[in-house]
């Protein structure tokens, strides 16, 4: 949620930010209109309350003086004022709900360093690491390799759950688990993150804090009986962990890592990446979240990206880092870097991590603040999030980049202590 004061004081700036995102800026005029009406209603209500209080004092005085007729007239006026005040209070509540809803629908303001563009074609490549492998044989896609070994099963997954699910057996199941443990070990032992075990079902309020609601409810799985949502990413419970709290500056930054399955309906992705494991309704991910201060959050974002890159470097998988343009930014993000791994089956780089600074966008929704060391004043924290990394896509990248002419796949050296085997199958 962006600051209503910013909209009041500099509406043209906010409108231009929305235009850069490809969003309709008309919502800002609607917000200003409702905000003005809401504030005028509050003023009128307070004036009537003041008049009613004055009447109460005068009634007591008049009765004491024996002027009962005048007192009765004021009592009647007080009753009329009470009815007006009640109606205004209802109007005030209704306007505040409308205002809050519209504010929740406004995306974050892009940072000045974000390239301006309409869509992903105008994202800017920042750097590359490694070179895509040149095969001296025709490489197979992961959706051919896994089933050929009998270790990746899409048909039984479909029988169990429908499309966009996968069953894995034996060495592939162990490789998935090895990747999770490897990533958690790197981030906790080398990068200083605190591992957190979080719920996979969260309240409506929680998932509103992190920005999925109210705008993207159709993308989420909802357990309607209890009004709990399956998390689309561990960012949700991690970023909302300190909602309603005041932290001390000396505690910051807080760096959290969590492994969870993630659940997404993918309602808007019909026809995209229909083969294999690239776009699933359920997938594993190791998530990184920082809670930090405004003055260092963009510096911290650079470190977060490097932490995610380390995983791919240790796995020796070629990748590139891309700065997303304004038109491709996520709803909550002020700045995002995507890390894209090379996949031979696509002959292209595909996203395996997305790292964002959402500034105080989530902190305002969740009332997450810290006390400044310098003057004791309270300020909203900044939150960062990033995949560290998507486990299923890492497995896919290993299968496709490490395959050998005989149809087997060599396990990356750093994973062998976790898997207990060097070759698949």
UniProtKB/Swiss-Prot annotation:
One of its GO terms (biological process) is seryl-tRNA aminoacylation. It catalyses: tRNA(Ser) + L-serine + ATP = L-seryl-tRNA(Ser) + AMP + diphosphate + H(+); tRNA(Sec) + L-serine + ATP = L-seryl-tRNA(Sec) + AMP + diphosphate + H(+). Pathway: Aminoacyl-tRNA biosynthesis; selenocysteinyl-tRNA(Sec) biosynthesis; L-seryl-tRNA(Sec) from L-serine and tRNA(Sec): step 1/1. One of its GO terms (cellular component) is cytoplasm. The gene is serS. Keywords: Aminoacyl-tRNA synthetase, ATP-binding, Cytoplasm, Ligase, Nucleotide-binding, Protein biosynthesis. PANTHER family: SERINE--TRNA LIGASE (PTHR43697:SF1), SERYL-TRNA SYNTHETASE (PTHR43697). InterPro entries: aa-tRNA-synt_IIb, aa-tRNA-synth_II, aa-tRNA-synth_II/BPL/LPL, Ser-tRNA-ligase_type_1, Ser-tRNA-synth_1_N, SerRS_1_N_sf, SerRS_core, tRNA-bd_arm. It is found in: Cytoplasm. Catalyzes the attachment of serine to tRNA(Ser). Is also able to aminoacylate tRNA(Sec) with serine, to form the misacylated tRNA L-seryl-tRNA(Sec), which will be further converted into selenocysteinyl-tRNA(Sec). Its EC number is 6.1.1.11. The keyword Lipid metabolism does not apply. Consists of two distinct domains, a catalytic core and a N-terminal extension that is involved in tRNA binding. Belongs to the class-II aminoacyl-tRNA synthetase family. Type-1 seryl-tRNA synthetase subfamily. This is Serine--tRNA ligase. Homodimer. The tRNA molecule binds across the dimer. L-serine binds at residues 233-235, 287, 387. It comes from the Bacteria. ATP binds at residues 264-266, 351-354. One of its GO terms (molecular function) is ATP binding. The keyword Nucleotide-binding applies.
